[in-house]
């Protein structure tokens, strides 16, 4: 890419090039990512200034010939003109992506008449040209683009809409007459019309800023803001690729900085007790970077805050991370990037914190209130000591700001790799949404009206890549709310549709609310209650500070991932007491040790083989899905819609984390839309079935398959539970649908206990190197397998040496009950039958498979049943 000075010089040389004497030489500034709102803003601003203008209508047909664009253009009512357009050079400004623009130097050369074919691209243009000076004209164009069969089908209709309006078009009435919407593209271009030898790079920058100021009156401040972010990034990032993203505006301050993660129980389980971590309070402020650069001191937060100058010799750079209170101009530092020219980003937090207080003192020299956040190093795992530590931080009354949570900082990692978690009471967890009023006359059952309320839809932002990987679809009415140009960008709005509540994007706004006219605004909201088909949302405030971001077309409230992970704290509330005692419901807390590697791989292989039998099915239900251990297998199998049901909220929260992890780190050929339902499967089948059928988009006829891996033993306490399970499967499956159970086989377990003469309260063990690897404790006295209710204790690979109680599965009784409820047995097989296939799959793992592993695996099997 050339420099701007070089491009201007090349432009001037073109006029002395004899080979170009019959060519049209154009120097244009083209603005990118123009949506309807931006277009309308600039258009109305120019009309209001009563700048001389003209309107033209044209039809350009573009045909690709040997990688060149050959064009036929008809500027109505004149004749066709044939030419080819050849780009020579371009220069792209380093602006925020939503305000980005580039300078283009190109030539148009006449060519012979050519014949159009079906590959032609047709562009109908309604252009208003504002001659803002003798040197520059601004062209604002509404474009309709047609290709292939669209040309013959729609050309006449769009010519009428764009050109043949009832009244003669002027700059003042054009927008009203053609009423542009999502059918169109929008272009803003500035063309130089002065003497070539008079043009300078400074002239280009000046006119560019003039138009950008029309788009955003704060543009020059935004430019300074972006330059400040570049300065910070230059001291944090070493990758030229990442720095380029900052310079191009694709990344802003939020993407640059390590983010504080909303902590769920699943997160906390992984490092509880948090010995070695640092704890401080969460101030109710905004994230900000305090910078001392030369003689200037400023804070980069939601905007650029200039806080003064030393008036003395330039200082070495100091860069601090913290929370900023804009109204009071107060800064509370919690990390340091650079202190007096010394870069600290590769040091652990325990080292950086020593320099933080010194950096704060440098800020204080600028006569602003700056403090270091109070940190406590957690040194004890005792819950009582932890409680006192957390209380001393969260319940402290002497802080100069309101406290709305707790921050936990991991030691030992670099600045960018430091894990920082925030805990907030459920009430203080809020989300930012772009709110749009629901279009009328959609006739969507889920959009049922409520008297005294107006229905609005809640949107967040999402990348095109994540949208595809999560297999999301736009909600009904979406195309009426957002133009096609916005939907074709890399980042666009999507309805807030978390896995556990797909209709969470519905908001019924009270007619009596003090917040009026909320359509098109960004609102901070909290969940008050989850109703059957919608969420009872409360408006906290209108984010007036985000309205300008919204106009740029690159911001739509929270990012989808951030929003759903924050939402998890409504789904699985995390109490203050659990910070000290540890999260409740820690069934999945233990990790498998290395001795289970081969056996675990064998079980995984078998489950993978079973799930592949249902590959590419439309709707699959997993009963007892847990934290999503099989999620990757479903994704590999190309399941289109997966419904996971479990009563463990913490496990389901972990599953949702895995959903995003798979979407960002693993490649799958097919995308899967994931839904979760927090539900005890022992409850009545009718109630559970109704909840599943209420899932947005779930087919009336039912799912294609139901899978339950190593779960149904929980439902073998009584014959009533087994009956309920069979009824549930029948209600949820389509005719011909399949049930796939993997389970410990009660018959085989009883046989093992008899063979080893294990009596009541005695334990069968399988040891390796004097270590108990597998164990079953007999908790029943009967010598014969009962239909239900016989309990055993099982030592699980992830149970940290503790026995977990479960019921024996009488497979004969299970099959009998299912047959009674309209199912047929398709297949029943022991896991041991897969061992030869596993040997072929991985000879290295098979070699370390022990006899104990094989014995344990032989206790399991799978059952396949079909709904008649």
Swiss-Prot record:
GO terms for molecular function: GTP binding; mRNA 5'-cap (guanine-N7-)-methyltransferase activity; mRNA 5'-triphosphate monophosphatase activity; mRNA guanylyltransferase activity; polynucleotide 5'-phosphatase activity; RNA binding. Probably catalyzes the second reaction in the mRNA cap formation pathway. Forms a covalent complex with GTP. Keywords: Early protein, GTP-binding, Hydrolase, Methyltransferase, mRNA capping, mRNA processing, Nucleotide-binding, Nucleotidyltransferase, RNA-binding, S-adenosyl-L-methionine, Transferase, Virion. It comes from African swine fever virus (isolate Pig/Kenya/KEN-50/1950) (ASFV). S-adenosyl-L-methionine binds at residues 607, 624, 646, 710-712. GO terms for cellular component: virion component. Part of the viral DNA-directed RNA polymerase that consists of 8 polII-like subunits (RPB1, RPB2, RPB3, RPB5, RPB6, RPB7, RPB9, RPB10), a capping enzyme and a termination factor. This is mRNA-capping enzyme. In the N-terminal section; belongs to the dsDNA virus mRNA guanylyltransferase family. The record marks 627, 658, 713, 806 as: mRNA cap binding. InterPro entries: CYTH-like_dom_sf, mRNA_G-N7_MeTrfase_dom, RG7MT1, SAM-dependent_MTases_sf. Its EC number is 3.6.1.74, 2.7.7.50, 2.1.1.56. Pathway: mRNA processing; mRNA capping. Residues 594-868 form the mRNA cap 0 methyltransferase domain. Its main location: virion. It catalyses: a 5'-end triphospho-ribonucleoside in mRNA + H2O = a 5'-end diphospho-ribonucleoside in mRNA + phosphate + H(+); a 5'-end diphospho-ribonucleoside in mRNA + GTP + H(+) = a 5'-end (5'-triphosphoguanosine)-ribonucleoside in mRNA + diphosphate; a 5'-end (5'-triphosphoguanosine)-ribonucleoside in mRNA + S-adenosyl-L-methionine = a 5'-end (N(7)-methyl 5'-triphosphoguanosine)-ribonucleoside in mRNA + S-adenosyl-L-homocysteine. It is found in: Virion. The N-terminus contains the mRNA 5'-triphosphatase domain, the central part contains the mRNA guanylyltransferase, and C-terminus contains the methyltransferase domain. The active site is at residue 282. CDD domains: AdoMet_MTases. Induction: Expressed in the early phase of the viral replicative cycle.
């Amino acid at each position: 890419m050339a420099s701007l000075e070089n491009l201007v010089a090349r432009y001037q040389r073109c006029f002395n090039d004899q080979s170009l004497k019959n060519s049209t030489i154009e120097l244009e500034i083209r603005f990118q990512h123009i949506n309807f709102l931006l277009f309308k803003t600039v258009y109305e601003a120019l009309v209001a200034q009563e700048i001389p203008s003209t309107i033209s209508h044209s039809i350009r047909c573009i045909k690709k010939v040997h990688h060149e664009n050959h064009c036929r253009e008809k500027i109505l009512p004149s004749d066709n003109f044939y030419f080819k357009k050849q780009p020579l050079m371009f220069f792209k400004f380093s602006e925020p992506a939503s305000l980005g623009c580039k300078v283009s130097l190109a030539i148009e050369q006449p060519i012979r008449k050519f014949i159009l074919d079906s590959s032609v691209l047709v562009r109908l243009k309604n252009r208003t040209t504002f001659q803002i000076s003798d040197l520059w004209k601004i062209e604002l164009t509404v474009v309709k683009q047609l290709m292939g069969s669209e040309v013959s089908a729609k050309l006449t209709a769009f010519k009428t809409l764009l050109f043949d309006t009832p009244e003669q078009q002027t700059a003042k009435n054009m927008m009203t007459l053609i009423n542009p919407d999502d059918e169109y593209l929008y272009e803003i271009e500035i063309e130089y019309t002065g003497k070539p030898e008079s043009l300078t790079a400074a002239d280009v920058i000046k006119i560019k800023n003039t138009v950008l100021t029309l788009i955003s009156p704060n543009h020059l401040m935004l430019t300074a803001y972006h330059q400040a972010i570049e300065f910070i990034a230059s001291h944090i990032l070493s990758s030229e690729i990442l720095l380029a993203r900052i310079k191009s505006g694709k990344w802003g301050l939020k993407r640059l900085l390590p983010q504080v993660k909303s902590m769920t129980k699943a997160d906390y389980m992984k490092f509880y007790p948090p010995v070695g971590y640092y704890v401080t309070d969460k101030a109710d402020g905004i994230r900000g970077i305090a910078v001392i650069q030369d003689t200037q001191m400023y804070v980069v937060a939601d905007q650029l805050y200039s806080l003064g100058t030393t008036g003395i010799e330039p200082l070495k750079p100091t860069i601090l991370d913290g929370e900023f209170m804009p109204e009071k101009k107060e800064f509370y530092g919690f990390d340091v990037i650079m202190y007096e020219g010394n870069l600290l980003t590769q040091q652990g937090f325990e080292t950086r914190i020593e320099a933080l207080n010194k950096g704060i003192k440098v800020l204080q020299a600028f006569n602003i209130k700056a403090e270091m956040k109070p940190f406590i190093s957690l040194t004890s795992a005792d819950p009582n000591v932890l409680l006192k530590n957390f209380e001393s931080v969260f319940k402290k009354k002497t802080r100069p700001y309101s406290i709305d949570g707790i921050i936990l900082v991991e030691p030992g990692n670099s600045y960018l790799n430091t894990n920082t978690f925030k805990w907030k009471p459920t009430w203080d967890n809020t989300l930012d949404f772009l709110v749009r009023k629901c279009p009328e006359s959609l006739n969507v059952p889920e959009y049922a009206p409520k008297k005294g309320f107006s229905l609005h839809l809640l949107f967040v932002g999402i990348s095109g890549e994540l949208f595809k990987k999560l297999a999301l679809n736009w909600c009904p009415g979406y195309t009426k709310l957002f133009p096609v140009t916005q939907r074709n960008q890399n980042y666009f709005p999507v309805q807030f549709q978390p896995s556990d509540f797909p209709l969470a994007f519905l908001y019924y706004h009270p007619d009596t609310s003090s917040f009026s006219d909320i359509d098109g605004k960004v609102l901070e909201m909290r969940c008050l209650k989850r109703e059957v088909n919608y969420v009872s949302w409360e408006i906290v405030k209108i984010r007036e500070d985000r309205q300008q971001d919204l106009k740029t077309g690159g911001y739509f409230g929270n990012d989808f991932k951030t929003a759903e992970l924050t939402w998890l704290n409504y789904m699985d509330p995390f109490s203050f007491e659990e910070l000290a005692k540890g999260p409740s419901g820690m069934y999945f807390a233990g990790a498998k040790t290395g001795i289970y590697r081969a056996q675990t791989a064998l079980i995984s292989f078998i489950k993978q083989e079973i799930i592949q039998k249902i590959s590419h099915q439309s709707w699959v239900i997993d009963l007892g899905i847990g934290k999503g251990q099989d999620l990757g297998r479903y994704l590999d199998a190309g399941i289109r819609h997966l419904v996971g049901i479990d009563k463990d909220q913490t496990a389901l929260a972990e599953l949702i984390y895995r959903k995003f992890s798979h979407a960002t780190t693993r490649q799958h050929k097919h995308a899967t839309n994931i839904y979760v339902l927090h539900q005890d499967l022992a409850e009545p089948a009718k109630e559970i079935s109704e909840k599943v059928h209420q899932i947005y988009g779930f087919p009336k006829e039912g799912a294609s398959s139901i899978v339950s891996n190593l779960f149904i033993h929980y439902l073998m306490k009584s014959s009533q539970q087994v009956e309920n399970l069979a009824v549930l499967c029948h209600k949820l499956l389509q005719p011909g649908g399949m049930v796939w159970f993997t389970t410990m086989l009660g018959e085989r377990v009883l046989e093992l206990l008899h063979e080893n003469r294990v009596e009541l309260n005695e334990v069968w063990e399988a040891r390796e190197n004097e270590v108990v690897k597998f164990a079953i404790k007999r908790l029943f006295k009967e010598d014969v397998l009962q239909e239900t209710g016989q309990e055993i204790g099982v030592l699980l690979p992830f149970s940290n040496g503790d026995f977990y109680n479960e019921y024996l599965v009488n497979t004969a009784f299970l099959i009998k009950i299912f047959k009674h409820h309209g199912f047929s047995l398709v297949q029943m097989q022991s896991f041991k039958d897969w061992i030869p296939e596993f040997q072929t799959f991985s000879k290295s793992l098979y070699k370390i498979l022990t006899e104990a592993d094989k014995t344990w695996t032989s206790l399991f099997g799978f059952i396949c049943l079909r709904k008649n």
